[in-house]
Amino acid sequence: MSTFLQSFKISQASDEYKQRRKTQMLKFFTASAITILTSRFAYRSTIARQYVPTLFQGNHSPPLSYNFTTDAAVAVATGTILCGSVSSMLVLGGFWILDVSNLGEFGWRMKEKLGGLEKEKHLGEMEMDEESRYIQDSLNDLLDGKYDFEEEGGNNSVA
C-alpha cells in the first residue's frame, strides 16, 4: 500500500477533494439504481411475454397471435439497456475506487502505474538515427509549408 493511503486522513482533506469523492459516489449510486431498475424491467417484460399453455395445449408452439419481430425488438432493447447500465456501473465504480474523475486522468494514472513516464523519458533521451531525423524534418517542413513540390521537378518518388 502506498504511503499516501497510509497517511491520508479524511479530516485533513480539502473541501474540493470531499466534493469530488461525493460526486463520484453519487454517479456510481445513480448508475447502480438505473441497473436495478432496468433489471426489474427486463425481468417483468420477460415474464409478461412468457407463453403459458392451457390444460390440453402443447407447450412447444407459441399461439398464432405471437409476433416474433416485436419480441426480438424488445429483447434487443432490453439487453442493450442492461448492458449499458451494468457497464456504466462498473466503470463509475472503478473510477470511484481509483479516485479518477475523467478518462484523461485515468490514462495518466495507468501510464504512471505501468511505468510509462520513465519509458517515455528514456525514449526521449535516446539518439535518433539519420533516417528517422530526415523523415521527421521532412514532415515538419511539409507541415510548416516550407516544402515546395515544384522544386522537385515532378519527381515525387521516395529514395
Swiss-Prot record:
Q: What is the topology of this protein in the membrane according to its UniProt annotation?
A: Multi-pass membrane protein
Q: Where in the cell is it found?
A: Membrane
> Which Gene Ontology cellular-component terms appear in the entry?
membrane; mitochondrion
- Where it mainly occurs, coarsely classed, is membrane
Source organism superkingdom:
Eukaryota
Q: Which InterPro entries does UniProt cross-reference here?
A: AIM11
Provide the transmembrane region boundaries.
Answer: 25-43, 74-98
Keywords, comma-separated and alphabetical: Membrane, Transmembrane, Transmembrane helix
**Which PANTHER family does the entry mention?**
ALTERED INHERITANCE OF MITOCHONDRIA PROTEIN 11
Q: Which family does it belong to?
A: Belongs to the AIM11 family.
The protein, known as:
Altered inheritance of mitochondria protein 11
Q: What is the organism field in this record?
A: Candida tropicalis (strain ATCC MYA-3404 / T1) (Yeast)
